[in-house]
Design a protein with these regions (language model features):
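Extracytoplasmic catalytic/substrate-binding loops of multi-pass membrane glycan-assembly enzymes
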Residues: 36-50, 56-62, 67-80, 88-92, ...
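Multi-pass, polyprenyl lipid-linked donor-dependent membrane glycosyltransferases
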Residues: 42, 72, 93-101, 125-155, ...
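Loop-to-helix entry region of an early transmembrane alpha helix in multi-pass inner-membrane enzymes
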Residues: 71, 75-83, 87-107, 124, ...
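Membrane-interface anchor segments at the N-terminal boundary of transmembrane helices
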Residues: 93, 304-388, 392
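Transmembrane-helix motifs of polytopic, lipid-linked glycan transferases
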Residues: 93-117, 367-374
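Specific aromatic-rich, kink-prone transmembrane helix
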Residues: 108-112, 148-167, 171, 175, ...
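Membrane-interface alpha helices of multi-pass inner-membrane proteins
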Residues: 127, 159, 168-182, 192-195, ...
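Membrane-proximal stem/loop segments at transmembrane-domain junctions that anchor or position
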Residues: 233-332
Length: 438
């Protein structure tokens, strides 16, 4: 009787912690949106301008005018945002979309963990840790694809774990939609199929999943073909990223100089009229040729790329410094060191505290995730987490083929939180047990 009361009390504490963490997440996202005052730059600016153009001209992306763009990216996100901007041209839609998809992500992680583990303690632990990651806080203030993609991707995984062909068809639809936002189906599709197989789903469930995805791909591709003359379903940025990470001057992160005159990615002024498809194929070919000719150098870059990919998680602090200071680069981190040592040219700011907390909580969650992998093999429960580990492993492979950047690990933060939650409850002798269907 005492054990039952203790378990109920623990369950109540974890549930309260999850609710409190989610409320904190909502509040901190709202604060980030209110504090971001600087003009948006980079991808955020590009997505916004593309969506605004589509809204004002009653068209969709990509259109014929994009045929000679550097690349096509963020297709699904741009089109969603453009539809909302036709109602009213306000950046508030960005905040609303980001916060809505964040809540979809939180609920999806909870459902996944409930299916993986008996009881809700591990699910609440995973949600608590996920909501405490400031990467999710600050991202709400920018018109980027991360939160939209993550919400759709993990909703797809959650639906795949439910019973019934309708859920699996919906999972396929959501998977295709998330890939329309960000082209990572090459990672998610095989691991979702593995998840369905490990959970002993029938062939009709797998067929429903594939048909759901195929229906969305065909619909979007055909609609784009009628608009632009080309069957375009997903972004085409692989060539650019591969070449930035694989050239003579590559250091593991971005190297934009590879596109300059005299470099292997240079396209002369006389050839500026090439389409994004031709350009993408050219960049891929140049990158592959470089890898083949410089295999030892490519291998040497692997640790650097993975270091850039996983070592820091500080980009969420940018909005809390007004948006004008990027917090995911070495110059900022050096300036923060000087501030902490009393040598800085400015005082300690709220955004600095967010950055420090972000790095600390990220490293803690990542460490718990690593411990859970070891613990799962010891407990003999590794099979249930295998598809999620596979997603992360394939993501590392993509980083090795392209470039390593801190923001690129953001879509996999929920997997880190899930592993950490599992370790806290099951790996350390808690009550969480593997799902019987696995």
């Amino acid at each position: 009787m005492t054990d039952l009361r203790n378990r109920d009390a623990r369950r109540s504490r974890w549930l309260a912690a999850a609710i409190a963490a989610d409320l904190l997440l909502v509040v901190m996202q709202a604060v980030a949106c209110a504090m971001y005052r600087a003009p948006h730059t980079g991808d955020a600016q590009s997505y916004w301008e593309l969506a605004l153009y589509c809204a004002q001209n009653h068209t969709f992306y990509p259109s014929p005018r994009d045929e000679f763009a550097l690349y096509i990216f963020g297709n699904g996100y741009v089109n969603l945002l453009s539809l909302l901007l036709r109602i009213r041209e306000t950046y508030v839609w960005v905040y609303a979309v980001n916060m809505a998809f964040t809540q979809l992500l939180v609920f999806s992680v909870y459902r996944i963990m409930r299916r993986l583990c008996e009881g809700r303690e591990a699910a609440c632990a995973a949600v608590t840790l996920l909501c405490l990651l400031p990467a999710l806080w600050g991202e709400a203030a920018s018109s980027r694809t991360e939160l939209c993609f993550m919400g759709l991707a993990f909703a797809s995984l959650a639906c795949a774990m439910e019973d019934g062909t309708g859920w699996h068809a919906l999972s396929g639809v959501l998977m295709a939609l998330c890939n329309w936002v960000r082209p990572l189906m090459v990672i998610l599709l095989p691991m979702t199929l593995l998840l369905l197989i490990l959970r002993k789903k029938r062939l009709r469930c797998i067929a429903a999943y594939l048909l759901g995805a195929a229906a969305v791909i065909a619909t979007i591709g055909q609609a784009t073909k009628s608009l632009s003359g080309h069957f375009i379903y997903q972004a085409q940025t692989m060539g650019v990223n591969m070449l930035m990470g694989n050239n003579d001057d590559a250091d593991g992160s971005y190297d934009n100089t590879v596109f300059g005159e005299g470099k292997i990615g240079y396209i002369s002024e006389d050839e500026r009229g090439v389409t994004y498809q031709v350009r993408d194929a050219f960049y891929k070919r140049q990158a592959v040729d470089w890898i083949v000719r410089h295999i030892p150098r490519f291998v040497q870059l692997i640790p650097r790329k993975l270091f850039y990919f996983l070592s820091t998680d500080t980009y969420g602090g940018t909005p809390y410094l007004g948006g004008g200071t990027e917090t995911d680069n070495l110059p900022y981190l050096l300036s923060l060191r000087d501030v902490l040592l009393g040598r800085g040219e400015r005082g300690f700011a709220f955004g600095d505290a967010v950055v420090i907390f972000s790095q600390l909580i990220y490293m803690a969650v990542l460490a718990l995730f690593a411990l859970d992998i070891v613990s799962a093999f010891r407990r003999g429960t590794w099979v249930r987490m295998l598809p999620f580990w596979g997603i992360f492993a394939l993501a590392c492979g993509i980083a090795v083929l392209t470039v390593g950047a801190p923001r690129y690990h953001m879509p996999y933060l929920p997997i880190f939180a899930m592993g950490a939650g599992d370790y806290l409850l099951a790996g350390r002798g808690g009550a969480a047990e593997p799902d019987e269907t696995v």
